[in-house]
Amino acid sequence: MDTLASLYTKHLATLQQRARTILERHQLDGLLIHSGEPIARFLDDQDYPFKINPYFKAWVPVTQVPNCWLWIDGVNKPKLWFYSPLDYWHSVSPLPQAFWTEQVEMTAQRHADDIAALLPAARGNVAYIGPNAERARSLGIDEAHQNPQAVLNFLHYHRAYKSEYEQACMREAQKIAVDGHQAALEAFRAGMSEFDINLAYLSATGQGENDVPYDNIIALNRHAAVLHYTHLERRAPSEMHSFLIDAGAEFHGYAADLTRTYAANGQSDFAALVAEVNQAQQALIATLQTGVRYTDYNLQFHQRLAAILRHHHILTGISDEAAVAQGLTTPFLPHGLGHPLGLQVHDVAGFMQDELGTQMAAPDRYPYLRCTRIMEPGMVMTIEPGLYFIDTLLAPWLEGEFGQHFNRGRIDALRPYGGIRIEDNVIFHAHGVENMTRDLHLA
């Protein structure tokens, strides 16, 4: 098996080839990639938690250090100016010595403003990739070369194809997240609050709330009906009905994004509903293959969802086909089936059909679907169907043209549980799909 170091060498060669292509196409001398800068809180002497430029961590696994720079010409070793000030007020990251450092030409940068003197003098024909336009201007980068859209389109599009190194990092992120999910489930079964369940998760992963790739969703009971619930109640509810956890982890800048839902009473109707959504998700994953547009799989799950809703008498007096055709499944599943995953949780280019940036929007019926691409080898996607009882979405349907098909009694009985989401992370390969999450036996 290849080591992470050897996989990184191949990964870097791929990035260099992409850089050569885009530099030649637009007659540029190089890419100047900025890790980013701290952002100060208003009227405060503290900064917001730092989040690095995803294009920086694509080249080097540096994820928490601001004021760093990469110079890429596609031919020579990437030049890395690593910010390492002499500072007794704050902890300072030392110059890295790791599996990847021999592949770059690294120099310590003691002051953030030193970069102007360290960079090559000729910078008029360089593309700046980063978050700070003012800094780019101060370095003499023309506005037209600051995050040029044509360059970003090319880079975004090809980010969908994960190298073997990236896939290996994402498998490691899965392992960390699975440890957290198992600890969180134990905390739920022990009757802990959302706040304490989250602490158990973070402790098990060894990652702080600013290290995980997104704010953890730890939702008990009705809170599971809020798709991005992040409030974290300090007290446990007097009665436990359900637990939805959507929480991830990072490894070398690459994300895992996993969701599970549990019933407090394993013999309840809600537990049976969770089991059926889980089975439907696994059945859909068994059909995944390259060469199929992701929108087709989204529609396929709505067909499966209609069958579940009818089986549990939540929808009545209508066929599966008619329920989907008339949109009756949409208030129960308002989000899309999933999204690209990688350097960012909602990774870029889900709608891009080519490297020029041609877009295909989500279908009108499913406007929150985050991907319309044809699946190809190397793509990493989440598969995260759900079934929710959201008052604001159900109300117009209950009173509308098709209201007679919605079983109010069943819906009212299930409202206290909030909802269900089951999410796995999969890699598309030429001859099949790898479910990284289930391979680690996360039930």
Curated annotation (Swiss-Prot):
Gene3D superfamilies: Creatinase/methionine aminopeptidase superfamily (3.90.230.10), Creatinase/prolidase N-terminal domain (3.40.350.10). One of its GO terms (molecular function) is aminopeptidase activity. Binds 2 manganese ions per subunit. This is Xaa-Pro dipeptidase. It holds the Pfam family Peptidase_M24. Its EC number is 3.4.13.9. Belongs to the peptidase M24B family. Bacterial-type prolidase subfamily. One of its GO terms (biological process) is proteolysis. Splits dipeptides with a prolyl residue in the C-terminal position. Mn(2+) 1 binds at D257, H339, E384, E423. The lineage of its organism: Bacteria, Pseudomonadati, Pseudomonadota, Gammaproteobacteria, Enterobacterales. Mn(2+) 2 binds at D246, D257, E423. Its cofactor is Mn(2+). Keywords: Dipeptidase, Hydrolase, Manganese, Metal-binding, Metalloprotease, Protease. It catalyses: Xaa-L-Pro dipeptide + H2O = an L-alpha-amino acid + L-proline. Signal peptide: none annotated. GO terms for cellular component: cytosol.
